[in-house]
Amino acid sequence: MFKKNTTHLRQLESESIYIMREVMSDFQNPVMLYSIGKDSSVMLHLAKKSFYPGTIPFPLLHIDTGWKFKEMYIFRDHIASTSNIELIVHSHSKGKLLGLNPFENGGSKYTDIMKTEGLKEAINKYNFDAAFGGARRDEEKSRSKERIYSFRDSLHQWDPKKQRPELWWNYNGQINKGENIRVFPLSNWTELDIWQYIFLEKIEIVPLYFAAKRPVLERNGVLTVIDDSRMKIKSNEVIKEKMVRFRTLGCWPLTNAIESEARNVEDIIKETLIVKTSERTGRAIDYDQKSSMEFKKRQGYF
């Protein structure tokens, strides 16, 4: 399938492009989930390559909780305005009306309603039968066992015991009405692969990935960048300016920063080469209960 002497990055690129084209032949109404992070940026870049010189034949879908970093919204709107592609922004209707937030409602309930239920609501509303996601197997243990074509039933639930075999590059996209497939074209990529590809292809990403002085609150041993005034600061807590960046991006109250001096992609690659922990250690929602990510995915999470 690969040309002789092809580099591993070009092999990964070729596999991802093949998957995207396969989805277009298997499904009637696919969509690409766009979370604004580095993986979404790489996935969007691959989609452009997959269908060049034509336009991307499916829309982007951003499930907006209202709690992303300001820089993420600016970047999202910039990409939408400079790319010839449709962007759908969807927020969970009842959750938005009730003003759910991660402080008063807790990270688990907030994530379930605003993200999981929000995604399910959007898929039902627009009748999407396939949704590209940027998940990778190296991120977290439940993702490591998930197929590239991840079958979801009519309730959007995932059952790891009922996954379909994927022999070589053969994928089973057969579904009944009301069912859908989550497709992960970056499954075999690693965090290092992502950064090396961003460097190789000069892909534009959110500046939050680069180290800069930011207002930080240290609470319970984790660093939270204060993005607006909605977080209640205790009387004994002090916000300090620190040189930090993010390895992963999500809702700002639930995403931990790391102290770093990496101000460009080359520095991030060097940092990634020596790090010993997964980037998902910076996501609070992954640790609110045992096997938290697998439970969320069973319920219909990304």
From Swiss-Prot:
Its EC number is 2.7.7.4. GO terms for molecular function: ATP binding; sulfate adenylyltransferase (ATP) activity. The keyword Nucleotide-binding applies. It holds the Pfam family PAPS_reduct. SUPFAM superfamilies: Adenine nucleotide alpha hydrolases-like. The keyword Nucleotidyltransferase applies. GO terms for biological process: hydrogen sulfide biosynthetic process; sulfate assimilation. Pathway: Sulfur metabolism; hydrogen sulfide biosynthesis; sulfite from sulfate: step 1/3. Keywords: ATP-binding, Nucleotide-binding, Nucleotidyltransferase, Transferase. It catalyses: sulfate + ATP + H(+) = adenosine 5'-phosphosulfate + diphosphate. Belongs to the PAPS reductase family. CysD subfamily. With CysN forms the ATP sulfurylase (ATPS) that catalyzes the adenylation of sulfate producing adenosine 5'-phosphosulfate (APS) and diphosphate, the first enzymatic step in sulfur assimilation pathway. APS synthesis involves the formation of a high-energy phosphoric-sulfuric acid anhydride bond driven by GTP hydrolysis by CysN coupled to ATP hydrolysis by CysD. Heterodimer composed of CysD, the smaller subunit, and CysN. This is Sulfate adenylyltransferase subunit 2. The gene is cysD.
